[in-house]
UniProtKB/Swiss-Prot annotation:
Organism: Picrophilus torridus (strain ATCC 700027 / DSM 9790 / JCM 10055 / NBRC 100828 / KAW 2/3)
Protein name: Small ribosomal subunit protein uS10
rRNA processing keyword on record: no
Role of this protein: Involved in the binding of tRNA to the ribosomes.
One Pfam family matching this protein: Ribosomal_S10
């Protein structure tokens, strides 16, 4: 039976997210299933301004810390063999993966 799997990847390092996308594309190519993506979604930018001086004295100077979250979306028409191989991918730290399966 052929399933439709929607794989969403997110992480703070875009190169690592792209490496995982290439692994998924390689599995899809080897098993001969149809793949759509990776579709780059908008990057979320989280900014936290922090006061440099801990005691509140002196001029108000601020540090701005920033974290960017990169997202990719991949749609795969997958059979059971492909899904098993997708589950066995080693995912590096800092990458979050979600798989939604529709029959």
């Amino acid at each position: 039976m052929v399933y439709k799997a929607r794989i969403s990847l997110s992480g703070t390092e875009n190169k690592i997210v792209d490496v995982v996308c290439e692994e998924i594309k390689g599995i899809a190519k080897r098993t001969g299933v149809e793949i759509h993506g990776p579709i780059p979604l908008p990057t979320k930018r989280l900014v936290v301004p922090v006061r440099k001086s801990p005691d509140g004295e002196g001029s108000p100077t601020w540090d701005r810390w920033e974290m960017r979250v990169h997202k990719r979306l991949i749609d795969v028409d997958a059979d059971e063999r492909t899904l098993r191989q997708l589950m066995r991918i080693s995912i590096p730290d800092g990458v979050r993966i979600e798989i939604q399966i529709k029959s």
